[in-house]
Amino acid sequence: AVERPRQDGQVHEPPGRERKAGCKNFFWKTFTSC
């Protein structure tokens, strides 16, 4: 769950919290950018 596409990103992690700060969290956590 490190290098996942954005569509897979919201699957391995709860869309509730990652949805709000997802753009920022996903950016540095994974390589996904909103």
Swiss-Prot record:
One of its GO terms (cellular component) is extracellular space. InterPro entries: Somatostatin, Somatostatin/Cortistatin_C. The keyword Disulfide bond applies. Disulfide bonds join C23-C34. The keyword Nucleus does not apply. It is found in: Secreted. Pfam families: Somatostatin. GO terms for biological process: regulation of cell migration. GO terms for molecular function: hormone activity. Residues 1-20 are annotated as: Disordered. Keywords: Cleavage on pair of basic residues, Disulfide bond, Hormone, Secreted. Somatostatin inhibits the release of somatotropin. Belongs to the somatostatin family. This is Somatostatin. The lineage of its organism: Eukaryota, Metazoa, Chordata, Craniata, Vertebrata.
